Amino acid sequence: MSFEKLADIIFGNVEHTTEYYVEKYPKRSLKEGARVTRYAPSPTGFQHIGGVFAALINERLASQSEGVFYLRIEDTDQKREVEGAIEDTIATMHNFGMDFSEGMTGEETSKGEYGPYRQSQRAEIYNTFAKDLLIKGLAYPDFCTPEELAQLRERQIANKITPGYYGEYAKFRNITEEEAIKRIENGEKYIIRLKSPGNPEKRVEFHDLIKGDISFPENNQDVVLIKGDGLPTYHFAHAIDDYLMRTTDVIRGEEWLSSLPIHVQLFEVLGFEAPRYAHIPTIMKQDGGSKRKLSKRKDAEAAVSYYKEVGFPVVTVIEYLLNIVNSTYEEWRAENPKADYHEFEVHLEKMGKSGALFDLVKLNDVSKDRIAAMKATDVYEYYTAWAKEFDAEMYKLVTENETMAKEIFNIDKEGPKPRKDFAKWDEVKDKIFYFFDELFYKESAEQIELPKGVTLEAAKEIVETYKKEFKFDVESQEAWFDDLKEIGIRLGYCANRKEFKANPDQYKGMISDVAGAVRAALTHRTNSPDIYTIMQIIGEENTRNRFDKFLNI
C-alpha cells in the first residue's frame, strides 16, 4: 500500500530524497581495516564511569586502526536534557585522554563533514527517510492514544499474550490513505510506526564481536519511528545516523542487545549495510555474596566526578579500565613497566562476555603502582593541580615549600622498590602532614601513635636519651641506624630478635621499639618512610624541637 499523497501531507517540508543524503555522506576514504567508532551519549546528566569505559574501547579501536572516533549527541529526549552536559562530556573525555576526530565541540559547534552531529538538528534527514518508508508502505501513521495503548497492554498481559503493538493488535496497521488523511485534517495526534515485515517464528543468525554467534527471532513489533513531537526514536535515529556517518563498529552496552532484532530489521528495511556490533558487558559491583550493576544512586564510584574529587590520577583509572577490557593488560604492563598505555592493543575477542567486575581495591593497587613509577616532579605537578581545587591548605603548603615537597615525593623513588604510599591524592595529606610544622603542631597528644607494647613513659625515656646522644650529621642511613642501635642497647633493648625471643625478660624490648619511639616523636605515626630520611628533610633544629614537644606531653 503506497501513501504518496499522505507522505506529502505529513512531510510536506522535506526538500531532499534519500539518495541525496546517501550521496552527500559517501563512504570514508580510509585505509583498509580502519574503524569508525563513536561515543553517542544523551545529555541528561553526569558522566558515568560506564560511559568512560565504553568510550575508551571505541577510542582505542579507532586510534589503533588509524580510523575515526567521533562524538554524536543523542538529544531526542529533550525533556531530560541537562544544561552544560555536552561541554561536560567533551571536557571529561579530554581529561581521560580521549579527543574526538570529529563531531560536537561545544553546545552549538562541531567539526567534520558528516554532521550535524546533534540529533535534534537532523530532523530533516530523519523525515526524509520516514517519508520514503511511508511511500513504500513500510510505515504508517498511528492514531492510538496513550490510554488505548495502556489498555491494549493490560488485555494482552491478562490473556497471556506477548505484549506490544504488532499484527492483529496494531489497530492502524492497515489504515487506508483516505482515513489517515481525514484523521489528520481533523487534528488527531499521531506518530509514525514501522510496518514490520518480521515473523517471530523465523530466526536471525548474527555475529557479535564480543558475544560471538547469537540467534534471535525476527522482530514483529511495529516500533515507533517518529514521535509525536516530530523527533525520531533512538532506534530509527541509530540506523540512519550510523549508516550516513559511516560507522563501521557500533560498540555499546549489553543492555542494547535486546534491541538488536529491531536494529537489524531497520537496516534491512532502509536498504543499508549494517555495521559490526559489539555489546560490552555491564560494569558490576560485588555487594556481599552477589554482584549487581554499578548504580548511580548507590555507588559514589559510578560518577566520573568521584575520581577527580578523591584524586585518582586519570592514567591510573584508564589503566584499570584497560585491565577490565582485556585481562592480558596486567601481564603486558608487568612486561612493559615504562611503556605508555597507548602502546597496548585492545582486542574485542579477548574481552569477557559476562559482567565486568569493578573492584576499587584493585583500582587502588593499580593506582599505587602507577604513582610509585612516576617521577617525583610529576607527582608534585599532579598533586598540586588536584590540591589547588580540593585542598587549599595543602596547596599553600606544598607550593610555598616546593623544594621540600619534591624531596618528600622523591623518598625511595630511585631505589629498586619504590614506596607505594598513595593510591589517590586525598591520601597524601595524612601520609606527609608531619613534614609541615603548620600541621604537625596542631596534633593533640591523643593523636600520637606509639609502637605496640611501648608505653608513653618508655617512649619518653627513649627519646630523652636519644635527643642527648644522637648524631645528626652522619654520612648514611646505615651509619644513622648503627648510632640508634648503640643507644638502644645501652638503654636495655635487644638488637637480635632470636636472642630476644629466647630471653625476653632480660630486655625492655627490641631496637625496633627504640626506632618506633623516635618515629612517634617526629611523625606521630607508627608507619612512615625511614626516620633518617625524615630527619634530613625537616632538619636538625626541627628534629630537636619535635623531641622537646614530645617530652612535654
From Swiss-Prot:
UniProt entry keywords in alphabetical sequence: Aminoacyl-tRNA synthetase, ATP-binding, Cytoplasm, Ligase, Nucleotide-binding, Protein biosynthesis
Superkingdom to which the source organism belongs: Bacteria
Gene Ontology molecular function, alphabetical: ATP binding; glutamate-tRNA ligase activity; tRNA binding
Annotated compartments: Cytoplasm
Pfam families: Anticodon_2 (PF19269), tRNA-synt_1c (PF00749)
Role summary: Catalyzes the attachment of glutamate to tRNA(Glu) in a two-step reaction: glutamate is first activated by ATP to form Glu-AMP and then transferred to the acceptor end of tRNA(Glu).
NCBIfam families hit by this protein: gltX_bact
Protein name (Swiss-Prot/TrEMBL): Glutamate--tRNA ligase
Organism annotation: Clostridium beijerinckii (strain ATCC 51743 / NCIMB 8052) (Clostridium acetobutylicum)
